[in-house]
Amino acid sequence: RQAICTAPGPQTAKLLEGFRPTLAMAAASTSYAPCLAAMVAFAERPTVEWCAASIQDGPLSFVAEDNARPGHQPALAPSRWILHASASWSAEHIEENPEVFAPLMLEAFGQLPGVQDLDPPVHLRGHRWRFALVEKTTTSAAQVEGTPPVAIAGDWCEGPRIEAAWSSGVRAASAIRKALT
């Protein structure tokens, strides 16, 4: 049967090696930066002068109040915040347990300008995204290989944005359809 593999490049390379070698080599040529994330909830909204921030220096690169997003629960208890670590900080801490890095990220949140006196959270959870930020896309033009046809798709095929992932998926589906006719 035909298939489209949309896993991150390094995972796709392992899945396809020895099975679809041209696609495996294309996938292996990609590289990623990791991103550690934390979700923190407070019983009451902390004193924070903003609801989202992109941060240039330090352990964190992005912070957002989840309750403030359109279509989400209004800013009532619990107050939920998403913390993303910088690529360099994430790379340094990627092998740590989430129970170790999430409190460090919470501490960094408490030290940001405009954040005052954080109460202890009612919830704190960390998550590892090993393949979060595409640093190098594949240089291969190969999209589909073999019989039955297997195609590759993802942000690592065309560019590090969701639009590129979508476009790549459409192209992969078209390549599969063409290979079947």
What are these regions (language model features)?
Residues 76-181:
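Conserved flavin/dinucleotide-binding core of flavoenzymes
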Residues 39-41, 54, 64, 84, ...:
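Residues in well-ordered beta-strands of folded domains
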Residues 12-13, 24-27, 37, 52, ...:
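Generic secondary-structure boundary/loop-capping signal
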Residues 1, 58, 119:
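Structured loop/turn residues at beta-strand edges in well-structured enzyme cores
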Residues 48-83, 91-93:
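Anionic-ligand binding region
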Residues 6-12, 45, 68-70, 86-90, ...:
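Short, solvent-exposed loop/turn segments at secondary-structure junctions
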Residues 1-53, 115:
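Central helical "cap/lid" subdomain
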